[in-house]
Amino acid sequence: MRRHAGKYYCFYSGANFLTDRYGVDFCVADQVLGPYSEAGGGSGARVLHSVPGHVRGPGHHSHALGPDGRTDYLVYHAWNAAMTERQLCLDPLAWTPAGPRADRGPSYSPRPVPGQ
């Protein structure tokens, strides 16, 4: 759960992690107890999703505030393309008019450490 710009966002990971549909989605409400919008509307994960050939099953995420005290990040794990290991990933969270999105995510290549 995350409050942003006066609204409450409930984030969750969903679908079968072995499929390209698995990822992080959200529903939103004006009050913490709801009612909440229909999540995804059947369109699949909107915040973060698999990238065939690079990363599968991104999810099980947390939110963190960056060292600048302003930038939101998603911290999550994902399978590598060969499905031999799960990797820890970190991507900026962008607040767009269409809702939150993993900015430049999911990670599947080295990225600079936040604040450096």
Named regions from a protein language model:
Residues M1-Q116:
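Carbohydrate-active catalytic/glycan-binding domains of CAZyme proteins
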